[in-house]
Regions:
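Catalytic cores of alpha/beta
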Residues: 1-3, 47-61, 103-106, 110-127
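Short beta-strand/loop segments at the ligand-binding rim of alpha/beta enzyme cores
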Residues: 34-44, 96-107
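Conserved beta-strand positions in the central sheet of alpha/beta enzyme cores
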Residues: 11-13, 43, 64, 128
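Active-site-adjacent beta->alpha loops and helix N-cap segments on the catalytic face
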Residues: 15-36, 49-54, 71-96, 113-114, ...
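Non-cysteine beta-strand/loop elements that form the S-adenosyl-L-methionine
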Residues: 61-69
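Short secondary-structure boundary segments
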Residues: 15, 46, 67-68, 108-109, ...
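Active-site beta->alpha loop and helix N-cap motifs at the rims of alpha/beta catalytic domains
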Residues: 1-23, 41
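Long hydrophobic alpha-helical segments typical of transmembrane helices together
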Residues: 109-152
Length: 152
């Protein structure tokens, strides 16, 4: 409630199959906020398409695979360097929330304008461009890795 009273119009919450300190699943936070502040927009950070479906059913206005790879359910091989979003997960999330009113925000590995447009074509309502802007050394490493592959 303090976040809302401070002026936030959108409240981001973890919406995964993890238990909070009070023993409830993280998804429950969405329902609790909507019950107390119905006009609040909820941005659900999810890990899987199932998380997205549950979050949307609980009342999330936006879902994003922000936590993909960071939870047990959405884990991927940390040794593998991924230079592109998980398009299969994006498609699955778009399908999972279809008809619920929740909008999909693609977040993670949106490193080029072409990737951003591809995500929109696949059903994302919007994209978040993070590291490509805020950490240019990571963008430079991606280019170097791709160009080095050409010479291999």
């Amino acid at each position: 409630k303090a976040v809302w009273e401070a002026g936030a119009e959108i409240i981001a919450v973890q919406a995964t199959h993890h238990y909070r300190d009070d023993g409830k699943l993280a998804y429950e936070t969405i329902r609790e906020i909507k019950e107390n502040i119905p006009e609040a927009l909820i941005f659900a950070d999810v890990s899987t398409a199932e998380d997205a479906r549950i979050a949307a059913e609980m009342g999330a206005d936006f879902v994003a695979p922000t936590l993909a790879g960071y939870t047990k359910a959405g884990a991927f091989d940390k040794l593998e360097i991924k230079d592109a979003p998980d398009y299969i997960l994006l498609r699955d999330i778009v399908d999972a929330v279809k008809g619920t009113g929740a909008r999909v925000i693609m977040e993670g590995k949106v490193a080029t304008p072409e990737i951003a447009v591809q995500c929109l074509y696949m059903g994302a309502y919007a994209v978040v461009v993070g590291n490509a802007i805020t950490r240019p050394h990571i963008t430079a490493k991606r280019f170097a890795r791709a160009l080095n592959r050409f010479h291999d």
